[in-house]
UniProtKB/Swiss-Prot annotation:
A zinc finger (Matrin-type) spans 4-36. It comes from Theileria annulata. It holds the Pfam family zf-U1. Belongs to the U1 small nuclear ribonucleoprotein C family. PROSITE patterns: ZF_MATRIN. Component of the spliceosomal U1 snRNP, which is essential for recognition of the pre-mRNA 5' splice-site and the subsequent assembly of the spliceosome. U1-C is directly involved in initial 5' splice-site recognition for both constitutive and regulated alternative splicing. The interaction with the 5' splice-site seems to precede base-pairing between the pre-mRNA and the U1 snRNA. Stimulates commitment or early (E) complex formation by stabilizing the base pairing of the 5' end of the U1 snRNA and the 5' splice-site region. U1 snRNP is composed of the 7 core Sm proteins B/B', D1, D2, D3, E, F and G that assemble in a heptameric protein ring on the Sm site of the small nuclear RNA to form the core snRNP, and at least 3 U1 snRNP-specific proteins U1-70K, U1-A and U1-C. U1-C interacts with U1 snRNA and the 5' splice-site region of the pre-mRNA. GO terms for cellular component: commitment complex; U1 snRNP; U2-type prespliceosome. This is U1 small nuclear ribonucleoprotein C. Keywords: Metal-binding, Nucleus, Ribonucleoprotein, RNA-binding, Zinc, Zinc-finger. HAMAP family: U1_C. PANTHER family: U1 SMALL NUCLEAR RIBONUCLEOPROTEIN C.
Length: 151
């Protein structure tokens, strides 16, 4: 029959049944050994001197990533939700099937890809169901009812 070892008390239990383990874990000796175990663990791990004794501490602690300057300057004028514009004569890398890296320049005999125009928001100047007659000045609109006149 396998014996149960209590890591907190550093003993083998004579009764390895679930009831025997439960009785041991509720005992005074086990609880005090468990408290002492965790207090010792906290003292050893959390109150250690810093690793960089005698040295200057690192400027950027943690997961600081160095900036990759090989990519060039950051792109300017790219709005969120819009793809950056490319020159029309350059095919993006990987767009040509069977040719790794794409082509270095324009393809002879093929017109360049047009650059899409940025979307200009259209502001409505008229309300729905409202027609304005530009030929008559100070005249009521076609859809409005006139309050002047014979009844």
């Amino acid at each position: 029959m396998p014996k149960f070892y209590c890591e907190y008390c550093s003993i083998y239990l004579t009764h390895s049944s679930p009831a025997g383990r439960k009785q041991h874990s509720q005992g005074r000796k086990h609880i005090s050994a468990k408290v002492e175990y965790f207090q010792r663990l906290v003292r050893e791990q959390f109150f250690q001197p810093p690793v960089f004794l005698g040295q200057t501490p690192p400027i950027f602690p943690g997961n600081f990533r160095a900036i990759n300057h090989s990519l060039g300057p950051p792109m300017m004028g790219v709005f969120p939700g819009f793809a950056p514009l490319q020159t029309p004569n350059i095919i993006p890398q990987g767009m040509m099937n069977g040719i790794p890296g794409g082509l270095p320049g324009p393809i002879p005999g093929v017109p360049p890809v047009p650059v899409p125009m940025p979307a200009i928001p259209v502001i409505p100047t008229e309300l729905p169901n409202m027609k304005i007659d530009l030929n008559q000045h100070n005249a009521p609109s076609v859809n409005s009812t006139s309050t002047t006149g014979a009844q």
